[in-house]
C-alpha cells in the first residue's frame, strides 16, 4: 500500500450538493434564493432583521448607564514600590508622588489623567518608612505604611 493508493470507503464521504448548475440538477436556475428581491442578490445580510418579528435588540430593555463621575485608578501594589526602591529608581528619602512614580516607570500614566491607588496585595510586611502622596490607599496598605513608620500626605 502506498500513500497515493489511499482512498475513502465507498459511501463514507458524501459529495456536497452543488447549487445553481442548471435546471436538471434539482437546485438550478435561482439556486434556492427565490425570484428577485433583496435576498436574492449577492452580498446581502440584513443585520438584526429577524423576518418581521421584533428583533432581540428591541425586545430587551435598556439597562445601566455610564457614570461620568466614575474615578479611574491606576492600581499599584506595595511590592511595585519595593522593587523600584531596590532597583534605585525611587529614593526612600523623598516624598513619593504620582509624578515620581511615572518617572520611575512604576505607573504608566499618560498626561497624568488617571488617579493612582495603592494596594497591598502579596505584601504582609513593609520595612521602609516612606512618605507617600497618592490619590487613594486601601486600608491594609495604609496600616502597613503607618506600621513601618511612614506617612501618608
UniProtKB/Swiss-Prot annotation:
Protein's UniProt keywords contain Membrane: no
Compositionally biased region (Gly residues): 23-35
Cellular component GO terms, alphabetical: large ribosomal subunit
InterPro entries: Ribosomal_uL15, Ribosomal_uL15/eL18, Ribosomal_uL15/eL18_sf, Ribosomal_uL15_bac-type
SUPFAM superfamilies: Ribosomal proteins L15p and L18e
Pfam families in alphabetical order: Ribosomal_L27A
Swiss-Prot/TrEMBL GO biological process terms: translation
Entry keyword annotation includes Signal: no
Cysteine-cysteine disulfides: none
Known role: Binds to the 23S rRNA.
HAMAP family assigned: Ribosomal_uL15 (MF_01341)
NCBIfam families: rplO_bact
Subunit structure: Part of the 50S ribosomal subunit.
Protein name according to UniProt: Large ribosomal subunit protein uL15
Organism expressing this protein natively: Rickettsia africae (strain ESF-5)
